[in-house]
């Protein structure tokens, strides 16, 4: 299910975006899935947790619109995982002594959010997402770096205004 915003195709809900990225973590970001919607406390839960081949925990925060709130969320989750011990078997491949990968994915980031991210988390990966239709009619979820270079993309199939994952 798609919507159009500022001339871009986007998934209609954050839940669809999250599910699609979760199911395609490896081809999109070279991460293995660890946990989705991990409860930090009653008010906070991390969207997606993954682990890279070196055992670093990746904390992903997704926004269907502007990524303004994602930086503070990533900071809270980084603090939580840095302090807590995790006996959950989902975390067995994670080396908590290694620096975490913090990734914010949104349809766009305004300049103040980008400046704030660079100040607070110098190595935070800020990625934009969009669904792009190519000339051959195929749709792809595209993740781009801030300089507009494509980091990764993966095919999706749209049938009768619905999203079919392939």
What are these regions (language model features)?
Residues 1-166:
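Charged, terminal alpha-helix-loop-beta segments
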